[in-house]
Amino acid sequence: MASIHRPKRGSLAFSPRKRAKSHIPRFRAWPEATGEPKLQSFAGYKVGMTHVIMVDDIKNSLTQGMEISVPVTVIETPAIRVAAVRAYTEDSTGEKAIAEAWAADLDSELKRRIPIPAAGNQAEGLENIGKLIEEGRVSDIRAVTYTLPKSLTGVPKKVPDIMESGISAKDLGAKFEYAKSILGNLVNVTDVFKNGTVVDTAAITIGKGTQGPVKRWGIQLQKGKHSRQGSLRQIGTLGSFNPSRVSWRVPQMGQMGYHQRTEFNKRILKIGSDGEEVTPEGGFINYGLVRGDYVLIKGSVPGPSKRLIRLRDPIRAKKADLGEPNILYISRESKQG
């Protein structure tokens, strides 16, 4: 039976629906650190979508062992550079950064994003963090990284995108030693993820500007004579007479899109270094050619082409590890119709 009461289809969980503060998505939590020391996140730029033919390796699936077509998102992932090591302390109000150590040699393009600290900060900063760890004042060690979009032909910008990444290690000492070893160096996507692993993706969605309540909230069109009185695509009422104010729950027009969205447990089907393996004839629409390292993610990822996409170790990991997928074919047919 159809639902009689249906004021809107949109979820109030995402309110307020306003523009994201930055095009760089944020991860506010990190999974528990296990295994060998490594970064817990990476970043790339969305290229577009295609499809692959692979063997279905999902247990108890109706098509298990059969060849299936799977849509995939292509993300170009050039190496990122570790700019700084950051130490956190925790008190009753939460975590706070108490010390940083910046690398001595950084790319000149980083000046376009932030003021670069003095070159002599590295040794002094690392020594300071080491003392804080010995005193027991440090709760976590993280790395500040930035991308190098100047190496991409499909992304028309030179300014790096700077972000923070957690470090996976068994204790603070191991985290600090690993952070010191990669400070100022390049990190490749193969140093963080491998084929078949599951990741969380975060991105800023496609911005659609100001939209009406029908498109923004999925309300019904007005019926009968109401639709002929100039209010076809409007809500029937702003609410009750009392209380004498408009509730934030009322579906109204406003900003749609350009919101941060995080999707959990997206499987990496392939990590490659030769972009020609996935570039279709004529290149990807609104992007062009993939020339370097890339990642194939099963399914869709938020955001338009050229948008920054962040990948993180899964915070709600599935128990079963499916292993490396068996990909038989990657479609390189033209996407231009």
From Swiss-Prot:
It comes from the Archaea. GO terms for cellular component: cytosolic large ribosomal subunit. One of its GO terms (molecular function) is rRNA binding. Keywords: Ribonucleoprotein, Ribosomal protein, RNA-binding, rRNA-binding. Residues 1-20 are annotated as: Disordered. The keyword Endoplasmic reticulum does not apply. Coiled coil: none annotated. GO terms for biological process: translation. Pfam families: Ribosomal_L3. Part of the 50S ribosomal subunit. Forms a cluster with proteins L14 and L24e. HAMAP family: Ribosomal_uL3_A. One of the primary rRNA binding proteins, it binds directly near the 3'-end of the 23S rRNA, where it nucleates assembly of the 50S subunit. Belongs to the universal ribosomal protein uL3 family. This is Large ribosomal subunit protein uL3. The lineage of its organism: Archaea, Methanobacteriati, Methanobacteriota, Stenosarchaea group, Methanomicrobia.
